[in-house]
């Protein structure tokens, strides 16, 4: 794990903010909220709730609760948050399947982060098998690599179901390019 003194780098992924005018959280204000929690080297990426920060805390569950509490206090929103160490995220990318994250413009590559306590088996049993000719999935740790045809995405099994009320609240999704950028920050 990248450690500076006793500090470790983490990524917080907020679910469902700044989408179609709902759950508005300005990134500059979010950054200040993280800094008030005594997190250091706070950076945000895009407007979709990607925050990179350093903390001396080892327990991602504690970090998650702190961040969710700050968001509730500062923005009066109940936002699911997924916290992961940068080291773990690097390991995930190093273990990506060969078919995921290449430069094929016909394919859309995503990484699905599964919010604890949900597990891959919960997600899979809720959504079902992918349509093999249109999409691929592979689970690893607390994520699912998911790729699908850009032109036929509406025909995939996972596209509409990842946003369903039952399972959608247990997931947050980022593109391959976004995840790579976050790791490099």
Question: Where are each of the predicted segments found?
Answer:
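Surface-exposed, charge/polar-rich loops and edge strands
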Residues: 7-48, 52-185
């Amino acid at each position: 794990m990248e450690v500076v003194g006793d500090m470790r780098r983490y990524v917080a992924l907020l679910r469902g903010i700044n989408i179609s005018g709902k759950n508005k959280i300005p990134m500059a204000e979010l950054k200040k909220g993280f800094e008030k929690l005594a997190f250091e080297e706070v950076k945000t990426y895009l407007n979709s709730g990607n925050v990179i920060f350093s903390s001396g805390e080892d327990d991602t569950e504690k970090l998650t609760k702190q961040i969710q509490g700050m968001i509730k206090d500062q923005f009066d929103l109940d936002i699911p948050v997924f916290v992961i160490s940068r080291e773990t995220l690097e390991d995930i990318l190093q273990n990506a399947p060969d078919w995921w994250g290449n430069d094929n413009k016909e394919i859309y590559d995503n990484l699905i982060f599964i919010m604890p306590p949900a597990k891959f088996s919960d997600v899979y049993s809720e959504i079902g098998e992918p349509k093999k000719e249109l999409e691929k999935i592979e689970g690893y740790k607390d994520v699912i690599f998911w790729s699908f045809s850009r032109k036929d995405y509406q025909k995939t099994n996972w596209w509409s179901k990842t946003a369903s009320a039952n399972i959608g609240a247990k997931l947050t999704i980022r593109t391959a390019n976004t995840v790579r950028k976050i790791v490099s920050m």
